[in-house]
Regions:
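Small-aliphatic-rich amphipathic alpha-helix that forms the alpha element of a beta-alpha
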Residues: 18, 33-76
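Glycine-rich, flexible loop/turn motifs
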Residues: 7, 64, 75, 102-106, ...
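Glycine/small-residue-rich phosphate/adenosyl-binding loop
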Residues: 1-47
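Short, well-ordered secondary-structure micro-motifs
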Residues: 1-2, 29-31, 75, 98-102
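Short, charged/polar surface micro-motifs in flexible loops or helix N-caps
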Residues: 23-27, 70-71, 95
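Generic structural "secondary-structure junction" signal
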Residues: 12-13, 48, 81, 108-112
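A glycine-rich helix N-cap at a beta->alpha junction
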Residues: 8-14, 78-100
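C-terminal helix-cap and adjacent tail motif
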Residues: 88-121
Length: 121
């Protein structure tokens, strides 16, 4: 799987790798043409992010993988052709504990009513 994910070899050390799949055909049945390309990706991405939060809360390390050879991942996992591989999520016990990265100040990323107007709490 690490080779299929552009040689991101840490994937091979993960205890488990979750593949998020979507069904583009399902969206065609439910939505008009302007929205069809969204839900088959959006719903699995929401689920993956919830898994990231849950795993982190439990002390596991995760890394959302979006760079991969979809055909190769589908071959390895025997995913039906009609489904799309949206993301990979390796989960495991981290082998390091780096300090948190610096974050932008709240006022630089949250705005009130229009971009550039800081949200005051």
């Amino acid at each position: 799987m690490a080779v299929a994910a552009n040689n991101q070899y840490f994937i091979a050390d993960a205890d488990v790798v979750i593949a998020a799949l979507g069904d583009p055909g399902e969206a065609r049945l439910r939505l008009d043409a302007s929205l069809r390309r969204i839900p088959h990706k959006q719903d699995p991405m929401i689920a993956i992010e919830h898994m990231v939060l849950a795993a982190t809360t439990l002390g596991y390390g995760t890394c959302w993988i979006g760079a991969f050879d979809e055909r190769e991942v589908k071959r390895i996992l025997k995913v039906p052709e009609r489904l799309a591989v949206i993301a990979l999520l390796p989960v495991g016990v981290p082998d390091e504990n780096p300090p948190p990265k610096p974050r932008k100040p709240f006022k630089e990323i949250f705005f009130r009513e229009s971009y550039g107007t800081p949200l005051e709490l």
